[in-house]
Amino acid sequence: MSRIGNRILTIPAGVEVSVASDNTVTVKGSKGTLTQKFAEVITIKVEGAELSTTRANEIKHTKQLHGTTNSLLQGMLIGVSEGFKKTLDINGVGYRAALAGSKLNLSLGYSHPVEYTIPQGITVECPKPTQIIISGIDKQVVGQVAAEIRSYRRPEPYKGKGIKYSDEIIIRKEGKAAGK
């Protein structure tokens, strides 16, 4: 069984953590503020510069919530102090991205350009027409935006065309062999 829930998290300098009576945690830092409500069976304590979680019982579901809560809290602490970033690369002839205000215009080989509205709290940059950098303080939202943009044209295994994460490895396939 994983022991992730038993980790004691260190609160970075310049970050304030407050826990309300209904188990709502508010984390304030230099990048912004995040608030999230957690299950009542998990007790969250702030002691000095340390954040710890304890569970009320040993039921399997409570143990799962314990680890999840601890990981979400760590993500909140990192998000408000450093932030999160995902980079997408675009491969393909004529495939490109351009920023127009709060919208991202994508040319992905369809008969029409794809327009994506950027959600609040997310910053999108296009340093090159074939690169998209998504950043923000909420790990879940950054990942969700990156996944939604990638879903418009997933990389295909034959030529590698499409939108992929910069650290993603596309396993290539060989095309059909010509018969005699």
From Swiss-Prot:
GO molecular function, one example? rRNA binding
Please list the coiled coil stretches.
none
At the top level, the lineage of the source is Bacteria
Q: Which InterPro entries match?
A: Ribosomal_uL6-like, Ribosomal_uL6-like_a/b-dom_sf, Ribosomal_uL6_a/b-dom, Ribosomal_uL6_bac-type, Ribosomal_uL6_CS
UniProt cross-references to Pfam families, sorted A to Z: Ribosomal_L6 (PF00347)
GO cellular component terms, A-Z:
cytosolic large ribosomal subunit
Q: Which biological process annotations from GO are given for this protein?
A: cytoplasmic translation
Which residue positions does the secretion signal occupy? none
Alphabetical UniProt keywords: Ribonucleoprotein, Ribosomal protein, RNA-binding, rRNA-binding
Q: How does it assemble?
A: Part of the 50S ribosomal subunit.
Q: Which NCBIfam families match?
A: L6_bact
Q: Please name the PANTHER family in this protein's record.
A: 60S/50S RIBOSOMAL PROTEIN L6/L9 (PTHR11655), LARGE RIBOSOMAL SUBUNIT PROTEIN UL6M (PTHR11655:SF14)
Q: Which family does it belong to?
A: Belongs to the universal ribosomal protein uL6 family.
Function comment? This protein binds to the 23S rRNA, and is important in its secondary structure. It is located near the subunit interface in the base of the L7/L12 stalk, and near the tRNA binding site of the peptidyltransferase center.
Q: What is this protein called?
A: Large ribosomal subunit protein uL6
Q: Which organism is it from?
A: Mesoplasma florum (strain ATCC 33453 / NBRC 100688 / NCTC 11704 / L1) (Acholeplasma florum)
